[in-house]
């Protein structure tokens, strides 16, 4: 089975491929149902093409799954030359009006039916096959038994199913709640996820609500009660659990699924990498290239990624899918940063030379001072050592890497290095140093706006993630702010 991962921008595309995806799906400009994802713009086609060369054999799918109005068709036609610059292998569409345009201008790209089309039966699949589609992304509402029936009826049609991620309480994209409450339509890519918002009542009704006596009752159905106040004082109206099928991949394979899809173009780099890695290992175990015991810790690491309560959705029956949850997804870790390719010898020497020059310049400045001024400067340095940082010093067997800080991290904080094939490696304080690569100064902390390098005794592949434990995390307690 193919592993298909989300890529909301170029960086996420790189991590999807590096951490094990056979294919990734992206959105281009305003024609994707994840408009709030970064999507792809400007000259990023050059970076995408470079990634395809770096990871030969990996596929690129492009979501053009909005409901096209005339203005959208005109806008797309006006940008055809731009779209042709991308090495797209397949388009994911729901609107049939765009199909003849794609077939004319992208004759070598495959057509995939989007889950937004809500395909749930074999006759619909036959129809799409006759129109030139090679794959259908089945609606999440289809059971595994129905998947098997569809595959048997149309064996030459590839079947793609979501295996992991958020689920909509409605048929995909057909919910009107966001449009009604906020004016932001799910069919145009602007879903505000109002179903997952947490609602309470105003002060006058709060005591009644807290008692549990305040409920909504439908006029003709007196036994159908909906509590207005629940959980930690708030009600999530229609918040579905997250889909998780990693423990049931063999069932999906036997049902005839050709491609496993991970939801989440708006999720973080950390989410994309960790979830892709877990499913890659699970699929490798299923194929027999690694053992189940080797895959197990990677599968367990899914709990270290932001998630809600999980479910198997509709695959084994509707009862499981109808269960809702409350609260935001959460994670015990904070993504601290990413590691680039190791500096070469000349680059490394330049950093050390910059550090030596920084110290020499400081000493020259002190030597030129009046004795009293020099003494005052030395006292100030003793009281505030951060004003005069030490220079990075060479250590045998250590390596220097570019480091992109994504959250403030104090030097000495325990770091966990995440790579595609190593579950995690812990770097304690004595095993690494943060430094400024421009002046060679040792840093006491790093921020996203800092120039930074990581100096360590560990060999780290480019693209490794660095995480730290979240001090505010409590197991079993879901924070309403999310992470």
Predicted segments — roles?
Residues 91-94, 116-120, 134, 138-142, ...:
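Short, well-structured alpha-helical patches and their helix-loop capping segments
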Residues 1-19, 23-33, 59-64, 71-77, ...:
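Surface-exposed amphipathic alpha-helical tracts and adjacent flexible/coil segments at the periphery
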Residues 9-12, 30-105, 109-122:
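Active-site beta->alpha loop and helix N-cap motifs at the rims of alpha/beta catalytic domains
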